[in-house]
């Protein structure tokens, strides 16, 4: 990222402090859930370092693989092992559940009403002639991004939703 020197140095110091605090949180926090979230902070700061060094594909891979998969797996394992400790004061329905339900339902309804009204022609469908001409001018990581955002957009989103639902279901089963 081409930033002026002072802003770049400030971001480096800020991310360095985030790494140090996250690392200390992983080691010093007594609750393993908080330690796992601190590890997620460390992974996010590392990916932001990659963005500052103009390695955008590596940063995206860092976020998807480490934060999105490894850290979630660690949190799932910790919740599965310590399930009896957290389910002692289990309430069937709380205020937070109601607020979450209202927010999720309103988001779902807004998406259902917005998606059919959106013109997807310019977003998804691109001409093959332009792709053939541009393939020599772009790198492999840009081609991966173009294919994920054009040809494989809907399957990519469906897979991410299926994985999210499976993760939530696994956490719900582990907590009972």
UniProtKB/Swiss-Prot annotation:
Gene3D superfamilies: NADH-ubiquinone/plastoquinone oxidoreductase chain 6, subunit NuoJ (1.20.120.1200). It is a multi-pass membrane protein. The chain crosses the membrane at residues 10-30, 32-52, 61-81, 92-112, 152-172. It is an enzyme of class 7 (translocase). GO terms for cellular component: chloroplast thylakoid membrane. It is found in: Plastid, Chloroplast thylakoid membrane. GO terms for molecular function: NADH dehydrogenase (ubiquinone) activity; quinone binding. Pfam families: Oxidored_q3. It catalyses: a plastoquinone + NADH + (n+1) H(+)(in) = a plastoquinol + NAD(+) + n H(+)(out); a plastoquinone + NADPH + (n+1) H(+)(in) = a plastoquinol + NADP(+) + n H(+)(out). InterPro entries: NAD(P)H-Q_Oxidoreduct_6, NADH_UbQ/plastoQ_OxRdtase_su6, Nuo/plastoQ_OxRdtase_6_NuoJ. NDH shuttles electrons from NAD(P)H:plastoquinone, via FMN and iron-sulfur (Fe-S) centers, to quinones in the photosynthetic chain and possibly in a chloroplast respiratory chain. The immediate electron acceptor for the enzyme in this species is believed to be plastoquinone. Couples the redox reaction to proton translocation, and thus conserves the redox energy in a proton gradient. Belongs to the complex I subunit 6 family. This is NAD(P)H-quinone oxidoreductase subunit 6, chloroplastic.
């Amino acid at each position: 990222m081409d930033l002026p020197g002072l802003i770049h140095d400030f971001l480096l110091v800020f991310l360095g402090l985030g790494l140090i605090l996250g690392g200390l949180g992983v080691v010093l926090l007594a609750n393993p859930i908080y330690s796992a979230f601190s590890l997620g902070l460390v992974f996010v700061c590392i990916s932001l370092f990659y963005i500052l060094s103009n390695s955008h594909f590596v940063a995206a891979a860092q976020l998807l693989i480490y934060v999105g998969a490894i850290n979630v797996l660690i949190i799932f394992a910790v919740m599965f092992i310590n399930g009896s400790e957290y389910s002692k004061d289990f309430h069937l329905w709380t205020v937070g559940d109601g607020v979450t339900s209202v927010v999720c339902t309103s988001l779902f309804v807004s998406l259902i009403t917005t998606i059919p009204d959106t013109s997807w022609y310019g977003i998804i469908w691109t001409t093959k002639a332009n792709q053939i001409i541009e393939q020599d001018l772009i790198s492999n990581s840009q081609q991966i991004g173009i294919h994920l955002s054009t040809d494989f957009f809907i399957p990519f989103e469906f897979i991410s939703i299926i994985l999210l639902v499976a993760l939530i279901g696994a956490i719900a089963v582990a907590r009972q």
